[in-house]
Amino acid sequence: MNEASLTALLLTLQYASLATAIVFVPGLLIAYVLARFSFPGKVFVSALTSLPLVLPPTAVGDLLLQMLATDGIRGRDILGVDLDILLTGKAVIVACAVMSAPLIIRTARIAFEGVNARYEAMARTLGYGPVETFLRFTLPLAARGLLAALILGFTRAMGEFGVTVTIAGNIPGRTQTLASAIYSAQQVGNDNEANFLVLVALATGFCAILAAELLSMRGVPSRKSL
């Protein structure tokens, strides 16, 4: 592995970690609301959170580009802030966050739906408030599924390519990730480097999932423990 590829790998780990950390807690809250509450427009919200999964990554990238570009629909006009982040590491984080969020939300929602709501009702009758019930009962019971959501979100962020190259480019040492480094190596005919990077991606992803499996088998209370 040359220096540029090593830098791309380290940047990928950094950007994927930051993106996952940013969307994980909001994703859990959205997943819990979708799993536990009924409200007008719930189907619409659920479909909207899954939209990046079915859209072509380049389409998602174009939508983000329109929000972030100086001649597009400015983020300043929508959010009241100037989002001048194109072709920067921040754009990579945005791309990774947008594409990993749907997996986090869907997996966490399944985990919350797997927790029997009667346990939460019992906790409320014992005097626990909604927040305390969520923290002391719901989260531990759903922990295995939530850990799976975290790992899936992280690995999806690591593998992000289409949205990243659209809004962040493929700048070595700045916005080039592992996926774009593989693409660059293929484009110049450096098959050995490309194949090696593919193996690195496989090994990294496998180790991440294996770690999640090992952690999920330790110290996680099951439903039967209540």
Enumerate the language-model features and the residues they cover.
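Membrane-water interface segments at the C-terminal ends of transmembrane alpha-helices
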Residues: 2-113, 137, 141-162, 185, ...
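Glycine-rich helix-loop "coupling/hinge" segments at transmembrane-helix boundaries
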Residues: 65-66, 163-189
